[in-house]
A protein has these predicted regions:
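Short Pro/Gly-enriched beta-strand edge/turn motifs at strand-loop
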Residues: 3-9, 103-107, 128-130
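Conserved beta-strand hairpin/beta-sheet module of binuclear metal-dependent hydrolase folds
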Residues: 1-51, 146-158
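A structural signal for the main folded, soluble domain(s) of proteins
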Residues: 3-5, 25, 59, 164, ...
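C-terminal regulatory/interaction regions
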Residues: 226-228
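Residue-level marker for buried hydrophobic side chains located in beta-strands
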Residues: 31-33, 62, 83, 154-156, ...
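Active-site HxH/HxHxD metal-binding segment of metal-dependent hydrolases
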Residues: 39-43, 49-124, 214, 218-222
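Metallo-beta-lactamase
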Residues: 38-39, 131-138, 142-220
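Short catalytic-loop micro-motif centered on adjacent basic/acidic residues
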Residues: 11, 31-34, 60-62, 134-136
Length: 228
């Protein structure tokens, strides 16, 4: 299903275990953020068509990190859409390393993926009516990013932060230290609308991030005690 939260931004939910995808209709180009798992591609395609967009009208696809529930359906789009990811995510996506091989649990072959543009922190993408700022937010994975629109104060957070302060698991390439630092950085920004990779959207963003920092610190301390 899809929902329009604010003008030119569409929320697309194809169902678990796939992530939430976000479509931004820009003045200059159309951008999809995260494609979901490959098995949900037909649902994604139909939801895009309900909005009035065919897959060949997508110009860019930005992946928030290197987990298959966020990039699996790229395989059906990468021949006609520019794929963007942070360079730390891109290296895993194209080489099918241990992080990406986890996608076999979803019955998917991890080989054959492409990333056309390797992004860095604070890269910007100007769509005319939307100004997208790339924030490198490692922690969940080393290649995790958030997409921030500073004028609309919207954050598309991938798996970095969720509503109600729910925190992400830490993957093999991530770390609690990086995760807490990334959350603290987000906590300095003005954000009115949180659009996470899973679950509900939120307008209580400052409270959500503060809860997430507290939860991450508690989990990190528990891990340190157990590790001893």
């Amino acid at each position: 299903m899809y929902d329009e939260t604010i003008p030119d931004l569409h929320v697309i939910k194809t169902g678990k275990p796939s992530c939430t995808s976000y479509l931004i209709l820009g003045d200059e180009m159309n951008v999809l953020i995260d494609s979901g798992i490959n098995q949900k591609f037909e649902i994604l395609k139909k939801d895009l068509e309900k909005i009035g967009i065919k897959t060949n009208q997508l110009n860019m696809l930005i992946n928030t990190h290197e987990h298959v529930d966020h990039f699996g359906a790229n395989i059906y789009l990468q021949q006609k859409v520019l794929i963007l990811a942070h360079r730390y995510a891109a290296t895993k996506m194209i080489s099918a390393d241990d992080e990406v091989l986890l996608c076999r649990a979803h019955g998917h072959d991890p080989k054959g993926y492409h990333v056309h543009i390797w992004m860095e922190n604070i890269n910007v993408i100007d769509l005319g009516n939307w100004f997208l700022k790339v924030l490198h937010t490692p922690g969940h994975t080393s290649g995790s990013i958030c997409i921030y629109e500073p004028y609309k104060k919207v954050l598309i957070s991938g798996d970095t932060v969720f509503a109600n302060g729910t925190i992400s698991n830490i993957s093999t390439s991530g770390s609690y230290g990086d995760y807490i630092n990334s959350l603290a950085r987000l906590n300095t920004m003005k954000i009115d609308l949180l659009l996470p990779g899973h679950g509900k959207i939120s307008r209580n963003v400052e409270e959500d991030i503060e809860k997430a920092i507290d939860n991450a610190k508690k989990k990190h301390n528990k891990f340190l005690k157990y590790d001893r």
